[in-house]
């Protein structure tokens, strides 16, 4: 963090049943917790080691009967400020999810969701593909059903919709110039409670595939875009800093918008 001038960051969980994530994660994550690849206990551990560096997030699976009770307790005991990252094989307008989202709205927690479409892996076991969220339409229904809740879209199935083409359900990282009229753009203009998380290969790819459009996009939605990483390198900063954006715009994306959603 110090190397890349990051003073503070949101620290997110990934709670997910064992049959809903790719076993290849065993190669890069110590899966010692029954609740998923990035359990809340691990985030608490890092927060306790450096409380000034982290804003604590937690996203219990809303299908669990005790999910809201667990989140409420985490807010009261550990000071959780963000509900994220939600990355599950469920439709995000599932009634249990909507109930959780509305609770987050009441508590002032922004909700971060990951979307992936069905890309065939060439395998049958344990799953032929790894879809999450049910696509952009299910996410839009959730946003519309919970107007008092702030949502942050994230992941390949979200960022592919920056362009109005047919690549979103064919490849995780679409290429080529952005075609005007993308679903993501329409939704950002229509729903004031929708924000976007620039992290990961998907967020970076959405910008780098068309740098000219990226500059226009970042300026238009400068009040609702949040810098994130998901990477150990500095690719996101390097690209953002190369676009000639004003310091005012960069300050909002790097820190201002996050502080607006989760004030210190």
Per-range role (PLM):
Residues 50-51, 77, 146, 191, ...:
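Acidic-histidine catalytic/liganding microenvironments
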Residues 22-131:
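Active-site gating/metal-coordination segments in enzymes
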Residues 1-8, 13, 72-73, 220-226, ...:
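Mid-to-C-terminal alpha-helical segments outside catalytic/metal-binding sites
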């Amino acid at each position: 963090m110090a190397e890349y001038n990051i003073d503070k960051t949101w620290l997110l969980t990934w709670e997910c049943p064992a049959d809903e994530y790719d076993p290849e994660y065993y190669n890069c994550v110590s899966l010692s917790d029954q609740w998923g690849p990035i359990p809340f206990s691990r985030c608490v551990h890092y927060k306790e080691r450096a409380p000034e560096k982290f804003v604590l997030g937690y996203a219990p699976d809303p299908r669990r009967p005790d999910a809201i009770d667990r989140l409420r307790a985490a807010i009261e005991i550990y000071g959780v400020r963000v509900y994220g990252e939600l990355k599950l094989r469920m439709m995000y307008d599932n009634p249990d999810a909507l109930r959780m989202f509305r609770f987050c709205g009441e508590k002032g927690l922004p909700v971060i969701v990951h979307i992936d479409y069905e890309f065939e892996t060439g395998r049958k076991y344990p799953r032929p593909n790894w879809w999450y969220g049910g696509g952009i339409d299910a996410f839009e229904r959730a946003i519309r059903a919970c107007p008092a809740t702030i949502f942050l879209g994230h992941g390949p199935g979200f960022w592919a919709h920056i362009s109005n083409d047919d690549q979103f359900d064919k490849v995780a990282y679409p290429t080529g110039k952005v075609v005007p009229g993308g679903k993501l753009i329409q939704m950002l203009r229509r729903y004031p409670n929708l924000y976007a998380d620039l992290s990961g290969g998907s967020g970076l790819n959405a910008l780098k595939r068309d740098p000219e459009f990226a500059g226009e996009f970042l300026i238009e939605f400068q009040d609702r875009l949040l810098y994130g990483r998901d990477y150990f390198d500095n690719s996101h900063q390097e690209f953002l800093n190369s676009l000639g954006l004003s310091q005012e715009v960069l300050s909002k994306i790097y820190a201002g918008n996050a502080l607006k959603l989760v004030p210190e």
